[in-house]
């Protein structure tokens, strides 16, 4: 039994308790983290929260070795939950009728305010800011004076920089693009008659895979084919040898392994080019690239029927549409994220056919972080990089006004030029 208030707990809090049957939290909890809560507690059948939890971010894992634990029991209040199938949210009317729970929420707010204004609280400040975002409007609705104190602490934490901001917050604050004088160059795309593309097209029978439908149908078929035939393994880098579809595919088969998002994007780009669909792969880079070495690589494909580029991501079998089902390109997705406009992630989006993706995570967290800078090749062809016997292109990065990405050959803030129609 936990008697007092808890600020935050994370990951497996209870492990290897063979005779433990129940856990009770008597006091309030500001936030939880991690999907695993208990591990190897075979007799555990109930976890009860008797007070308030601002953000309940727990799930029930099949491999937790707690076979009898099938739900969490709420006797108090959850203000926000990660999975509403295993825990429900209490409404404000229920809260207003329970002075004890209101008192506990006020104590949580006081603790959050201390964390937000403390020195050297870094990670905890960032975590509790997100929890405070949930609690503040509730306190406001209750006409609690603690709401003003908490808001002041939140404003102070925000003023310190990006520390407490979500990836979407940072993206919304990014400088805008402008229209510069265009480069004296245009993007180039290898024709299907290119020798290497003809070989790829024939070897994999890509015309049959793409099918006889419209251009959207054909690019989706190729997207799913690459996704289903080459697993993603971000830790395994690129396939040894040539950076092309044939070598990556054969290496993955031969070694029973996957490769990183860049490898998959190179493969899909080559497949699209081989059937006559102009395509580029885009390296999506975070604002904090100097310390954040995680980026993500997707593809864009030119749709004649829509007269624009569209987003296709072979790592997650993902594409993105607006509220009318029209496929979008990364620039349109970025704009809609910045302006809170509807974004729909396709229902099939998943990782390695094992983990389903959601718009909240994939777009508003993962890609919101990674579409601050967008880098692409000017010359798009089979084997676009690595050691080979044909000329390599240069890279250009689309950057917000006033910023540069030094690893690109060129930088531009002219988004119209970046998304130009293929010649």
Question: Where is each model-derived feature located?
Answer:
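Loop/turn elements at helix/coil->beta-strand transitions in domains of secreted/extracellular proteins
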Residues: 215-220, 273-280, 305-309
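Active-site neighborhood of thiol-dependent amide/isopeptide-bond enzymes
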Residues: 234-298, 302
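Secondary-structure boundary elements
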Residues: 158-259
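Consensus positions within tandem repeat domains that build extended binding/scaffold surfaces
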Residues: 11-13, 35-37, 60
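Structural signature of tandem-repeat unit edges
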Residues: 1-8, 16-31, 42-55, 64-93, ...
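Amphipathic, non-membrane alpha-helical rod segments
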Residues: 125-142
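His-Asp-centered catalytic microenvironments across diverse enzyme cores
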Residues: 291, 301-423
């Amino acid at each position: 039994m936990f008697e007092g208030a808890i600020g935050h707990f994370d990951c497996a809090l209870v492990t290897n308790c063979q005779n433990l049957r129940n856990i009770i939290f008597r006091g309030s909890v500001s936030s939880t983290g991690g999907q695993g809560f208990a591990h190897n507690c075979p007799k555990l059948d109930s976890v009860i929260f008797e007070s308030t939890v601002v953000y309940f971010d727990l799930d029930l894992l099949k491999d937790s070795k707690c076979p009898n634990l099938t739900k969490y029991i709420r006797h108090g209040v959850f203000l926000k939950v990660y999975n509403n199938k295993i825990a429900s949210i209490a409404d404000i009317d229920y809260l207003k009728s329970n002075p004890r729970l209101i008192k506990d929420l006020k104590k949580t707010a006081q603790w959050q305010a201390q964390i937000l204004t403390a020195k050297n609280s870094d990670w905890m400040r960032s975590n509790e800011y997100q929890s405070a975002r949930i609690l503040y409007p509730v306190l406001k609705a209750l006409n609690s004076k603690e709401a003003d104190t908490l808001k002041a602490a939140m404003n102070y934490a925000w003023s310190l920089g990006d520390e407490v901001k979500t990836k979407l917050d940072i993206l919304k604050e990014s400088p805008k693009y402008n229209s510069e004088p265009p480069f004296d160059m245009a993007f180039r795309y290898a024709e299907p008659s290119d020798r290497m593309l003809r070989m790829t097209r024939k070897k994999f029978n890509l015309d049959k895979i793409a099918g006889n439908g419209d251009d959207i149908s054909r690019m989706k078929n190729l997207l799913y084919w690459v996704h289903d035939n080459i697993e993603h393994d971000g830790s395994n880098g690129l396939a040894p040898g040539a950076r092309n579809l044939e070598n990556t595919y054969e290496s993955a088969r031969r070694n029973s392994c996957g490769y990183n998002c860049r490898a998959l994007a190179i493969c899909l780009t080559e497949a699209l080019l081989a059937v006559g669909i102009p395509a580029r792969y885009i390296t999506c880079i975070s604002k904090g690239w100097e310390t954040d070495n995680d980026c993500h690589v997707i593809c864009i494909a030119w749709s004649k029927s829509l007269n624009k580029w569209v987003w296709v991501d072979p790592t997650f079998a993902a594409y993105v549409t607006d509220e009318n089902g029209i496929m979008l390109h990364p620039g349109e997705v970025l704009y809609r994220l910045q302006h809170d406009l509807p974004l729909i992630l396709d229902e099939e989006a998943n990782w390695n056919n094992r983990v389903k993706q959601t718009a909240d995570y994939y777009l508003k967290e993962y890609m919101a972080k990674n579409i601050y800078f967008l880098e692409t090749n000017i010359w798009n062809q089979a084997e676009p990089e690595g050691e080979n016997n044909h000329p390599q292109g240069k890279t250009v990065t689309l950057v917000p006004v006033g910023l540069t990405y030094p690893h690109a050959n060129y930088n531009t803030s002219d988004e119209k030029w970046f998304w130009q129609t293929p010649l």
